[in-house]
Amino acid sequence: VSDYLCDMSTTDHISADRLIRTWVACGLTHAVVSPGSRNAPLVLALASHPSLEIVVALDERSAAHVALGMGLQSGRPAVVVSTSGTAAVNHGPAIAEAFYQEVPLISVTADRPSEKRDWGLGQSAMQNGLFEAHTRWSCEVPEHQNDMNTLDEIARTAWRKSQRGPVHINLSLDEPLYGKSKIEVPVLA
C-alpha cells in the first residue's frame, strides 16, 4: 500500500531554498535558528548545506545576538531565522546594535501569508517593515514568489546591503510547511 506522508526533512518552499542557496553562493558560512513551525522551511533549507555552521538558540533574542557576534568576528553577515509573531520582534535589540555598529547581519522572519494576518491568531504580529528604522534594507517576500531571478535579486541585494549593517527579510510561508515525499507505508497484519 502506498500513501503520501509528510517528510519533515524536506521543504517544497522554493523561496526559502533559493534565498539560502544564493547566500551560500555569496559566501554565507554561519546561521542561527530558533525552534518554530512557520520557519521550518528556512531551517530545512539551511540544514541542506553541510558547509554551514548552524547554531540553535532556544530564545530569539539570544539567537540574534549570537548572529551579531558572528558578524563582528567574521566581518561577514550571519543569517538569523525566527518563526512568526512576537518571536520575530525579539531580533530587534541585536538589529539596533548591528545598525549603529555597522555589523553585517541578515534577519529572516517567517510570516503567515498576507491573507491570514491580522485575524487575532496566535503568533501573528505586523512583521513587514518591523525594523525599518534600524536596517539598511528590508523586503517582504510574498508567499508564492517562485521566480528564480526575483529571488536571486532579493538575496543578492540583502547580501550586498548587509555588509554595512543589518537587513531584514520577511518571508511569507503558507502550509504545508514541510515537503511531501511519496513513501511506502507498510500494512500491519
Roles of regions detected by a PLM:
Residues L5-A189:
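N-terminal alpha/beta PP-like core and its mobile active-site loop of ThDP/TPP-dependent enzymes
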